[in-house]
From Swiss-Prot:
Cellular compartments per GO CC: cytosolic large ribosomal subunit
Pfam families in the record: Ribosomal_L14
Keywords: Ribonucleoprotein, Ribosomal protein, RNA-binding, rRNA-binding
Protein name as it appears in the record: Large ribosomal subunit protein uL14
Subunit structure and binding partners: Part of the 50S ribosomal subunit. Forms a cluster with proteins L3 and L19. In the 70S ribosome, L14 and L19 interact and together make contacts with the 16S rRNA in bridges B5 and B8.
Function: Binds to 23S rRNA. Forms part of two intersubunit bridges in the 70S ribosome.
Organism field: Onion yellows phytoplasma (strain OY-M)
Keyword S-adenosyl-L-methionine belongs to the record: no
InterPro entries from the UniProt entry: Ribosomal_uL14, Ribosomal_uL14_bac-type, Ribosomal_uL14_CS, Ribosomal_uL14_sf
UniProt family annotation: Belongs to the universal ribosomal protein uL14 family.
Keyword Ribonucleoprotein: yes
């Protein structure tokens, strides 16, 4: 379960390696998020185009908790991962590492699905 103060892995080539969740967008009383939700993060480690302590938006692409599909199956991952976004919700990086779920295209993140190495 991803909530405030959770540390997440960044899976794009923006330069950040690890981020910390400082806010959850989409409501005042939301306590946790799932795949496809947008969070407010701060960069904890990494180098490149984004610097340490930068505050950015990110979309959740993998969770340990997993995602339940309409056919009843679950997809779970080994880590909690995000892709960093600009203010206009376009992705910062040009590559996505590792698998992502195809349900991201239903949530208007089809660019992430098209750039991913593996779509489940």
């Amino acid at each position: 379960m991803i909530q405030r103060e959770s540390r997440l892995v960044v899976v794009d080539n923006s330069g950040a390696k690890e981020v910390l969740v400082i806010g959850i967008l989409g409501g005042t009383r939301r306590s946790h998020v799932n795949i496809g939700d947008i969070v407010l993060v701060t960069v904890k480690s990494g180098s490149g185009t984004v610097k340490k302590h930068d505050v950015l938006k990110a979309v959740i692409v993998r969770t340990k908790k997993g995602l339940r599909r309409k056919n009843g199956s679950y997809i779970k991952f080994d880590d909690n991962a995000v892709v960093l976004l600009k203010e206009d919700l376009n992705i910062i990086g040009t590559r996505i590492f590792g698998p992502v779920v195809r349900e991201l295209s239903d949530k208007k993140f089809s660019k992430i699905v098209s750039l991913a190495q593996l779509v489940l």
